[in-house]
Design a protein with these regions (language model features):
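Juxtamembrane "anchor/assembly" segments of surface/extracellular structural proteins
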Residues: 1-63, 105-109, 196-198, 205, ...
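Short beta-strand-centered interaction patches in the first periplasmic/extracellular domains
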Residues: 2, 7, 92, 99-108, ...
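Surface-exposed, non-catalytic interaction/assembly patches
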Residues: 19-24, 112-119, 161-169, 177-244, ...
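Amphipathic, non-transmembrane alpha-helical segments in extracytoplasmic/periplasmic proteins
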Residues: 43-47, 104, 113-141, 153-178, ...
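Surface-exposed cap/loop segments at beta↔alpha junctions
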Residues: 54-139, 152
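Short, Lys/Arg- and Gly-enriched loop/turn segments at beta-strand edges
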Residues: 73-84, 315-324, 428-438
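Intrinsic-disorder/coil detector with helix-boundary
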Residues: 310, 514-551
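Hydrophobic packing positions characteristic
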Residues: 332-343, 348-529
Length: 551
């Protein structure tokens, strides 16, 4: 097969750092490079391989490094992807025609390989990005974030899923290009690629829509430290296309009446986080005012995450657009690049979490084990681990639910370390746990003096027992009494059935009063001792009665 001069002159392919041999290029059918700002970059090389030489003798093999660059008509070269081979796909077709497809991804695919369960303590989102980039062998380009989280849990997520979720929450981009992991605010300015309709811009289909456009975004949450509502709001975003349209989406939408998007299902820890979340969501909305697809000829410099400056589209649509994905296709006809403008987010993360909702992994209750009760704030909080999630994953501080809980009021029983408890999460977010209460099991038995009841009957005993064995027991009919019993057996019984109070103590009994003490009986009163009885007063002793008998 003769070499394809158009195709081979427009691309350069390196395998493990070495330009592939010319005889391999003569077998090349097509090259596809797919770039996204929110998905791993992908490449696919298709070769004729009727003699099966590439399949059996290489040089392409799994895990090898592939770099692909494209050239403009002036000879300027632009890197398109630096990736690794993850799949080999031979195709044995009719007529004894065989093709060999080499497929791979940029190094961000390493962050998709394994789901992990772990907790991060006192960490910022930008710290996570730097840490994950290093683990994947990538350099990091990170815009610093300011909020420090006491505890963040990666719950059965891949590193990139988790990082993309964090990026979505604060309105950041998260993608890999040129061997770098980018974790940054979407750019609002920068160098752009100029394209002219009728020349190198082959086609462009924009769509201007007021769907979802609002004038304000408000985030409402709760600050338990100060016991106040948290409200973050904004009326501006930064992802409008920089075109000559006279009004932005919010202004146009205001013609229908002022619109507001209120977010109440995403827990926030502070006023600043609420404001950041509001800005992120408003920015996301502004990016959907103008969406578009376009195509250009021989422009490898069109890259995801960069700007294109479109010329010749009239007064309204000429201007700068931020590219969110670009697909470069090399065929015998030459290099064609299609690109999209899709606002802040498209692809994997937005499919998973929707436009306005967080990831709600845990809408129900889960089992946990208490690991720490030494709450530095003295709120009665505890930390727990989730045995089904991993032995090393510990939560942040979880507040307890107590009957009648309020200011210096309510029933508080902090569970001990090692106790099994039932936990729920605020709006399903695993980083905001609440402990509903403790559980009994095959090891942790129910308290003594507690019974069950046959069908149709109600249990006759209710009890509360401390860790050391002190207990309060309430008996309904027929016994009808309340017992307060210490671990050593000292007991006070309020007997409703027999209309009496019993104080049972094998040691001393002492009654003290700061002022007067009075004991009154409508019937008889009896004082009896096996030993002596002493009556002593610093003042006068008066004994009165209808008759006084002294024996």
């Amino acid at each position: 097969m003769p070499p394809n001069p158009i195709l081979t002159s427009q691309i350069q392919i390196k395998l493990d750092g070495t330009v592939i041999q010319h005889d391999l290029l003569t077998k090349l059918v097509s090259v596809i490079v797919d770039q996204h700002t929110y998905l791993p970059g992908m490449f696919a090389l298709t070769f004729f391989d009727t003699d099966l030489r590439l399949l059996d003798r290489g040089p392409f093999d799994l895990t090898k490094r592939v770099t692909i660059s494209g050239e403009k008509e002036d000879g300027t070269s632009f890197p398109l992807i630096d990736g690794e081979i993850t799949a080999l796909e031979p195709s044995f077709n009719e007529g004894m025609i065989a093709e060999f497809v080499v497929r791979g991804y940029d190094k961000s695919h390493r962050l998709f390989r394994e789901t992990k369960n772990r907790a991060f303590v006192n960490i910022k989102d930008s710290d996570l990005a730097s840490q994950f980039a290093g683990a994947a062998g990538l350099s990091a380009v990170v815009d610093a974030t300011s909020i420090v989280y006491d505890n963040l849990i990666q719950d059965n997520q891949t590193d990139l899923n988790f990082l993309m979720q964090r990026a979505w929450r604060i309105g950041y981009e998260c993608f890999v290009a040129d061997g770098r992991l980018y974790f940054r605010k979407p750019p609002t300015s920068g160098a752009s690629v100029s394209l002219t309709w009728g020349q190198d811009l082959l086609s462009f289909q924009p769509r201007m829509t007021l769907a979802e456009q609002v004038n304000e975004v408000m985030v409402q949450g709760w600050d338990p430290k100060n016991k106040v509502q948290v409200v973050g709001r904004t009326d501006s975003g930064s992802l409008y296309a920089q075109i000559r349209e006279s009004k932005d989406g919010a202004t146009w939408a205001g013609s229908f009446g002022r619109g507001k998007s209120t977010i109440v299902n995403q827990p926030v820890i502070s006023q600043s986080e609420a404001e950041n979340l509001a800005k992120a969501r408003f920015t996301e909305i502004t990016g959907t005012f103008v969406e578009a697809e376009g195509a250009a000829f021989r422009r490898p410099d069109i890259q995801a995450g960069k700007f294109v400056d479109l010329i010749g589209l009239g007064d309204r649509f000429s201007g700068k657009y931020l590219v969110t994905s670009a697909t470069h296709v090399f065929t015998p006809e030459g290099l064609k690049t299609t690109f999209t403008v899709r606002g802040a987010h498209t692809g994997l993360v937005s499919d998973e979490i929707g436009s306005h909702a967080p990831l709600e992994h845990w809408p129900g209750a889960v089992i946990a084990i208490v690991t720490n009760t030494d709450d530095p704030q003295k709120w009665g909080r505890v930390k727990v681990k989730y045995p089904w999630l991993g032995e090393t994953v510990e939560s942040g501080w979880a507040r307890l639910i107590g009957p009648g809980g309020g200011k210096k009021a309510g029933f508080l029983a902090i569970p001990e370390v090692g106790a099994e408890v039932l936990v729920v999460f605020e709006h399903g977010d695993i980083n905001f746990p609440f402990v509903l209460g403790g559980l009994w099991n095959g090891i942790d038995e129910i308290p003594p003096m507690t019974d069950s009841a046959p069908p149709g009957k109600f249990p006759g005993v209710r009890t509360w027992c401390s860790i050391d064995g002190h207990r309060i027991t309430v008996y309904d009919a027929p016994d009808s009494k309340i017992e307060i019993t210490t671990a050593s057996g000292i007991q006070v019984v309020l007997d409703d059935k027999n209309k009496k109070i019993l104080l049972d103590c094998s040691a001393d009994v002492e009654i003290k009063s700061g002022t007067n003490t009075k004991i009154t009986a409508t019937g008889n009163m009896k004082l009896e001792a096996s030993g002596n009885i002493d009556i002593q007063a610093s003042g006068q002793v008066n004994i009165k009665g209808a008759m006084i008998n002294l024996n």
